[in-house]
């Protein structure tokens, strides 16, 4: 059994200070869910499925020892803390932050609360383009296609424009300045 799992999340915001909210969200995810390793560029894209102001979207990959359900529960709490209000009405709405689990390793899961991989990822450029930018060796476990293949086949023709970059939290540690790193503890 793996101790660390690779999780791809999609973040979106179309209310308030969109970029600042996404940056704050990434910091909280890094502290509370798992180690954020890579972050895609931030894209601006039109609202999908409803009329509203444009979204800022990005994808990130993190490593965690939490289960898919634990990750979901943590991100729902983070969304609420960052101002997300769920009305319970059917359909899409503007939001300060939206965090979706796109992939968890290459697991296929279908429960009432969580479906993996995200069941609409292949239909959304605002998910596919940032996911591609993570440059992961990932294959959709149901469609047996890579992210570039999914992009080539999507029917979504919405324009997504890269507008910003956000450094990953670990990028501020200058590892190249160290000759070695020692880890304390038992080996074996």
What do the predicted segments below correspond to?
Residues 181-188:
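Glycine-rich phosphate-binding P-loop
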Residues 49-54, 72, 77-175:
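Flexible, gly/pro- and Lys/Arg-enriched active-site loops
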Residues 10, 127, 182:
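Conserved beta-strand segments that form the floor/walls of ligand-binding pockets within enzyme
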Residues 16, 102, 188:
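A short, conserved beta-strand element in the Rossmann-like catalytic core
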Residues 13, 99, 185:
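Short acidic donor-binding/metal-coordinating loop in glycosyltransferase active sites
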Residues 4, 174-180:
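A short, charged/proline- and glycine-enriched loop
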Residues 2-11, 15-96, 105-106:
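Nucleotide and nucleotide-moiety/phosphate-recognizing core
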């Amino acid at each position: 059994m793996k101790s660390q799992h690779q999780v791809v999340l999609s973040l979106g915001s179309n209310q308030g200070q969109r970029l600042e909210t996404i940056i704050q969200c990434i910091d909280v995810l890094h502290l509370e869910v798992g180690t954020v390793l890579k972050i895609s560029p931030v894209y601006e894209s039109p609202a999908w499925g409803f009329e509203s102001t444009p979204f800022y979207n990005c994808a990130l990959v993190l490593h965690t020892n939490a289960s898919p359900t634990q990750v979901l529960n943590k991100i729902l709490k983070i969304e609420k803390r960052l101002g997300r209000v769920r009305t319970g009405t059917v359909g899409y709405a503007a939001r300060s932050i939206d965090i979706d689990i796109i992939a968890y390793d290459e697991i296929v899961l279908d429960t009432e609360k969580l479906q993996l991989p995200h069941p609409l990822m292949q239909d959304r450029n605002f998910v596919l383009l940032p996911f591609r930018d993570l440059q992961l060796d990932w294959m959709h476990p149901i469609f047996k296609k890579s992210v570039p293949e999914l992009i080539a086949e999507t029917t979504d023709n919405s324009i997504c424009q890269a507008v910003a970059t956000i450094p990953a939290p670990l990028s501020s540690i200058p590892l190249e300045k160290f000759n070695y790193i020692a880890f304390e503890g038992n080996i074996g």
